[in-house]
């Protein structure tokens, strides 16, 4: 009987990624939570028990159903004008997550393009772009966001745009560093010899090799965007009432922290959970995508 050596098929990149990602329990919990939130956000019109702006003047400041005096029809209670908190939380989460994705897509698209151009060409153009980025980074994010929103006029759309603009520098610096590291490698030189144009070199040849840090930054960027959007809503320069946005809900509940603490506690816990989930998933993505950490 001859001994035949065992052979194992090499893992595909996706299998290898999942192998390292699932080692991080926190990242798995974050991913599951985010998937549940995404599903709830998509199905919000069908699972929310009430319209988030509907007022019931006979059910003002009802506590959650498990409190004394609570009503099972209003599982998380009602606010000072009789709106269902659960419905507003569902729609508020939907707005926050959707806005977070829009912010990250906009900032990543512009930031990555600028970073690729800056890193590829270098010289005076690189110096100008980096000096502008340094100026933006020298100003605290929240302060710069407030300035941009004030210029544009406070609203949910303008708050989203302002946060996207302020988030651009991190993507520029990441992409520029990756471009400068990659542009002189052999595969890029081979593509040049084969006749690849500048746009093809930047966006098709080099960019895919710069994606790992960008994916991690995008995940962390969503959590930052959700937190900043809630902050602007709380300050009164984000979403306007009666829009069921989490920060706006906190702002409206400030006067009831003693009499109806659930109006502050529930939206606050939702914001905390969303930010924590995206951060945990970002940590897992970093561990799975960074070759140094794998070693």
From Swiss-Prot:
InterPro entries per record: BP-dependent_transpt_permease, MetI-like, MetI-like_sf, OppC_N
Keywords: Cell inner membrane, Cell membrane, Membrane, Peptide transport, Protein transport, Transmembrane, Transmembrane helix, Transport
Family according to the record: Belongs to the binding-protein-dependent transport system permease family. OppBC subfamily.
Keyword Acetylation included in the entry's annotation: no
Gene3D superfamilies with a match to the protein in the record: MetI-like
GO biological process: protein transport
Any Pfam family hit: OppC_N
Gene Ontology cellular component list: plasma membrane
Subcellular location: Cell inner membrane
Keyword Flavoprotein part of the UniProt annotation: no
Signal peptide span: none
Domain ABC transmembrane type-1: from-to ranges: 93-282
Transmembrane segments: 27-47, 97-117, 132-152, 156-178, 202-222, 226-246, 262-282
Lineage of the organism: Bacteria, Pseudomonadati, Pseudomonadota, Gammaproteobacteria, Pasteurellales
Protein name, per record: Dipeptide transport system permease protein DppC
Membrane topology, from the record: Multi-pass membrane protein
Functional description taken from the UniProt entry: Part of the ABC transporter DppBCDF involved in dipeptide transport. Responsible for the translocation of the substrate across the membrane.
Annotated source species: Haemophilus influenzae (strain ATCC 51907 / DSM 11121 / KW20 / Rd)
Gene Ontology terms, MF aspect: dipeptide transmembrane transporter activity
């Amino acid at each position: 009987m001859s001994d035949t050596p065992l052979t194992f098929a090499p893992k595909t990149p996706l299998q290898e990624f999942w192998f390292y990602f699932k080692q991080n329990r926190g990242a798995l919990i974050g991913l599951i939570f985010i998937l549940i939130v995404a599903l709830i956000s998509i199905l919000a019109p069908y699972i929310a028990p009430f319209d988030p702006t509907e007022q019931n003047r006979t059910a003002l400041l009802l506590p959650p159903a498990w409190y004394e005096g609570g009503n099972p029809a209003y599982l998380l209670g009602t606010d000072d004008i009789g709106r269902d908190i659960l419905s507003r939380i569902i729609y508020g989460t939907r707005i926050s997550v959707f806005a977070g994705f829009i912010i990250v897509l906009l900032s990543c698209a512009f930031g990555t393009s600028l970073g690729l151009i800056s890193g590829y060409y270098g010289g005076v153009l690189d110096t100008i772009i980096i000096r502008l980025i340094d100026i933006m980074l020298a100003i605290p994010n929240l302060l710069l966001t407030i300035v941009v929103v004030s210029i544009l006029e406070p609203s949910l759309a303008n708050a989203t745009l302002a946060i996207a603009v302020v988030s651009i520098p991190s993507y520029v610096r990441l992409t520029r560093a990756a471009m400068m590291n990659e542009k002189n490698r052999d595969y890029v030189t081979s593509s040049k010899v084969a006749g690849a144009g500048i746009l093809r070199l930047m966006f098709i040849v080099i960019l895919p090799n710069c994606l790992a840090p960008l994916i991690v930054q995008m995940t962390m960027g969503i959590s930052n965007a959700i937190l900043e959007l809630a902050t602007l809503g709380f300050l009164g320069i984000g979403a306007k009432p009666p829009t069921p946005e989490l920060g706006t809900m906190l702002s409206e509940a400030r006067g009831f922290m003693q009499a109806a603490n659930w109006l502050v506690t529930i939206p606050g816990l939702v914001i905390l959970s969303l930010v924590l989930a995206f951060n945990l998933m970002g940590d897992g993505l970093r561990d799975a995508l960074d070759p140094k950490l794998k070693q």
